[in-house]
């Protein structure tokens, strides 16, 4: 998988709650150029350069290079990043999910990775957990899977 540095890169964080704010703070400390947040309210927060309401997601995705998903599991967030929205991301974009596995359509993600429609992805959360041995994600191109441990790590 191609490597992209945090320094001087732009990030979009889907979910500006506790996890999203912690991610933004760490990215800022490592030199991220711009951090955009998406939340239910779109209310500004000092951890983000810009914050938009979730209703703007389809407008933000086409200009997203690195998407960090930090959403809770609610009826509104189930498969919020679905096949149609994955298709809105640029082909050189990365998807990182550290929130809840239900927020991402994993079959659509695997299909996009295998078709070269995304540069790569990293998943710390899946649905279900643990991921079954025969799940197509295990064979997806340019995918890193970790066992839901990112919250216990220190930088």
Residue ranges of model-derived segments:
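Residue in the alpha/beta-hydrolase core beta-strand immediately N-terminal to the catalytic nucleophile
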Residues: 10-12, 94
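Glycine-rich Rossmann-fold phosphate-binding loop(s) that bind the pyrophosphate
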Residues: 16-17
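Flexible, glycine-rich phosphate/dinucleotide-binding loops
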Residues: 20, 43-44, 152
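Gly/Ala-rich phosphate-binding loop of Rossmann-like dinucleotide-binding domains
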Residues: 24, 28, 113-114
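Rossmann-like adenosine-cofactor binding region
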Residues: 33, 42-136
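Short beta-strand "acidic-cap" motif of Rossmann-like dinucleotide-binding folds
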Residues: 35-37
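C-terminal helix-to-coil terminal segments
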Residues: 129-155
């Amino acid at each position: 998988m191609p490597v992209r540095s945090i320094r001087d890169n732009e990030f979009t964080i889907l979910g500006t709650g506790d996890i999203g704010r912690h991610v933004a703070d760490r990215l800022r400390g490592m030199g991220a150029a711009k951090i955009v947040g998406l939340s239910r309210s779109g209310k500004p927060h000092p951890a983000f350069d810009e914050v938009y309401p979730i209703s703007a997601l389809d407008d933000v995705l086409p200009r997203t290079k690195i998407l960090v998903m930090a959403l809770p599991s609610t009826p509104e967030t189930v498969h919020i990043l679905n096949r149609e929205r994955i298709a809105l991301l640029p082909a050189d974009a990365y998807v990182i999910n550290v929130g809840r596995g239900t927020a991402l359509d994993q079959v659509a993600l695997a299909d996009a990775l295998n078709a070269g429609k995304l540069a790569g992805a990293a998943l710390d959360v899946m649905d279900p957990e643990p991921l079954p041995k025969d799940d197509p994600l295990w064979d997806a191109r340019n995918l890193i899977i970790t066992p839901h441990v990112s919250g216990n790590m220190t930088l």
